[in-house]
Amino acid sequence: MTTVTLPTVPSPPHSRDGADRRLPLPGRYTVAPGRSLVELTAWYGPLPVLRRRVTLGEASLTVPEGAESPSFRFEFDDRLFSAVLTSEEVDEVHGGRLQLTGDLDLNGLAFPVLLRLRVVQRADDRLLVVGHARPPYRLLRRATGFRLPWRRPATRLRLLVAAEFA
């Protein structure tokens, strides 16, 4: 019996140009007016009972130089839904997605929320993302006092966000 040694294929070197990164190069990026879409949907069981576009007042992405976590900030400015979503932790998950754990600041009270973003397009100076958060309406109402119109019963909300950071 003979032993055969097979050649090993070396692993490819890590990309130096950041092709495997999900975020743009370090810096601060904002969303230009008209380059975003935000929608608030209230659900009662399987039925959507309210669907409304929400104005995105300002949004920013800060990518630090080191190994620190980037930070996202979304300011929603609407008469029905005026809030600020600030990320505390940003994780890269499988399939080119980002998972933001942060606080939704409504009426001066912070409510924890999970925003899942899909990276649609990435360049060195630009990032296009689409994602959603699904906070439970009853807990949000009890914790922050946020209320929908009384004719709109709801069990959960969906906040849809699409933005191009440049």
Region annotations inferred by a language model:
Residues 1-166:
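Low-complexity, acidic/polar, glycine-enriched regions of mature
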